[in-house]
Amino acid sequence: MKSQTQAPLVVEGKLSDSERMKKESNFLRGTISDDLQNGLTGGFEGDNFLLIRFHGMYQQDDRDIRAERAQQLLEPRHAMMLRCRLPGGVITPKQWLSIDKFASENTLYGSIRITNRQTFQFHGILKGHVKPAHQMLASTGLDALATANDVNRNVLCTSNPEQSSLHQEAYEWAKKLSEHLLPRTHAYAEIWLDKEKVATTDEEPILGETYLPRKFKTSVVIPPYNDVDLHANDMNFIAIAENGHLVGFNVLVGGGLAMTHGDKKTFPRLASEFGYIPIDKTLAVAEAIVTTQRDWGNRTERKNAKTKYTLERVGIETFKQEVERRSGVMFDMIRPYQFTHRGDQIGWLKGVDNKWYLTLFIESGRLIDKPNAPLKTGVAEIAKVHLGDFRLTANQNLIVAGVPEAQKEQIEAIARQYGLINDEVTPLRKHAMACVSFPTCPLAMAEAERFLPAFTDTLDNIMAKYGVSDEHIVVRVTGCPNGCGRAMLAEVGLVGKAPDRYNLHLGGNRMGTRIPRMYRENISSQEIIEILDTLIGQWAISRELNEGFGDFLIRTDVIKPVVNSAIDFYEVQEVI
């Protein structure tokens, strides 16, 4: 990456309006409590529209019926999406049954969506049910604080069931990081849980009174598994173990995938290696990284406010040295690590604890009762008898964790009865991913989750035609360039531009360590299928042993690799 060391550490200029909103919010309170009493609208108004994001919610509406309601002179059917804070994705069966009941009784869609940030979210919570939603979470020991907006979001942790002892240590650090970096304001408890206003003044010693310049994402990674897609995150801790126990972390900073169509000052970026730290320095280093980004991040232009742009502007070494100064910790040389897997291992695995772990493939993470496949009910039935816990994965799947040998047959029987196990699911489908997009996401430009099943059906047929059905290609679809579907770490990435129009990116790799380059701009799904039919056919015939699709495209000069995205991401690819 570039190392420009002469740039100003703080960007001068008029602050974005989001900065005004945060400063005037009285530590994230705004007038949310008053808005809750306003029955004239189903939404939150003014600054509250954005402030509720700090409380884990986005205001949405059903875009399928937006035009119809406008014709009837009705406001959009506002409803909230609420996202739980669930570091490491671990949740108990008792907690699961509570959220299952709430989804059935108090949401418009009756579904639970497992996200690729290892948590779950509800879609379609009407305003009158918002406060009960937060109270339900609190009653089970959960909350939605800081799962959106300019804070450290839900902390990811590798969900590797085979390394159960190491996973437990890494998971504990994911929880510690989440708690350490949480907002300290009492606003959440006052507004949603009816806690009395504390007389003392709120302080935010880490995040500051205007919080971070932009969203901030953190992961804890256990090699050789990159299931959390570390390069999508601002701050990453790669576990280094000795004799089966954590001794420290390699620290990587500045990953991120979001961009803006037509704005070449925005681009996806891989995280940069800072160095190795011993385990007891983790929180000090994490805090120093966050506060450096807090102070140096661009608060004048939100499109360039993320950590990745701060590193590009001030230089990697300058940022790293500031982290060392603030933390009092000097980075050591990076310890050796490698990645060999990214997708989840669907099916049963036995852990070192001699318990069993069943990873269930959940397409796009959507748990809903479908005809002939009541998936949501099935998970609830498992929760009623399961003695271990559940783990939500960063690939939007669900692990039934810690199953005793004596219960294994019972758990599998329930899963099969409710359609949660399907032996016909192909490797390509297991590795595919899509964001939510239409009808609920206000930023969606093209279909993603609703588009993915038919798209993967077609690709499966192409794979079968060329005799490569046992192989997989990492295919991801995101409905807009914000990148929630992590298409910028796929071998085949589709980025929505308009209804049935996508930018096609090719040339990422299976491990998620290379950004794909745009191959064609603004083309239809049919055009994409025709292109992939040809290229998959070539790959099937001419690939080398164990050569992935993305690697093949680069070796054969179909696409040029992105080497330094800050410089070469927008280089024009010649049509071949």
Swiss-Prot record:
UniProt superkingdom: Bacteria
SUPFAM superfamilies linked to this entry: Nitrite and sulphite reductase 4Fe-4S domain-like, Nitrite/Sulfite reductase N-terminal domain-like
Coiled coil residues, start to end: none
Gene Ontology biological process: cysteine biosynthetic process; hydrogen sulfide biosynthetic process; sulfate assimilation
Sequence positions that bind siroheme: C484
Matching PROSITE patterns: NIR_SIR
Pathway: Sulfur metabolism; hydrogen sulfide biosynthesis; hydrogen sulfide from sulfite (NADPH route): step 1/1
Residues reported to bind [4Fe-4S] cluster: C435, C441, C480, C484
Pfam families tied to this protein: NIR_SIR, NIR_SIR_ferr
Keywords linked to the UniProt accession: 4Fe-4S, Amino-acid biosynthesis, Cysteine biosynthesis, Heme, Iron, Iron-sulfur, Metal-binding, NADP, Oxidoreductase
InterPro entries referenced in this protein's UniProt entry, alphabetically: CysI, NiRdtase/SiRdtase_haem-b_fer, Nit/Sulf_reduc_fer-like_dom_sf, NO2/SO3_Rdtase_4Fe4S_dom, NO2/SO3_Rdtase_4Fe4S_prot, NO2/SO3_Rdtase_4Fe4S_sf, NO2/SO3_Rdtase_FeS/sirohaem_BS
Entry GO MF terms: 4 iron, 4 sulfur cluster binding; heme binding; metal ion binding; NADP binding; sulfite reductase (ferredoxin) activity; sulfite reductase (NADPH) activity
Catalysed reactions, semicolon-separated: hydrogen sulfide + 3 NADP(+) + 3 H2O = sulfite + 3 NADPH + 4 H(+)
Entry EC number(s): 1.8.1.2
Cofactors, names only: siroheme; [4Fe-4S] cluster
PANTHER family to which the protein is assigned, alphabetical: SULFITE REDUCTASE [NADPH] SUBUNIT BETA, SULFITE REDUCTASE [NADPH] SUBUNIT BETA-RELATED
Its biological purpose: Component of the sulfite reductase complex that catalyzes the 6-electron reduction of sulfite to sulfide. This is one of several activities required for the biosynthesis of L-cysteine from sulfate.
Quaternary structure, from the entry: Alpha(8)-beta(8). The alpha component is a flavoprotein, the beta component is a hemoprotein.
Name this polypeptide is given: Sulfite reductase [NADPH] hemoprotein beta-component
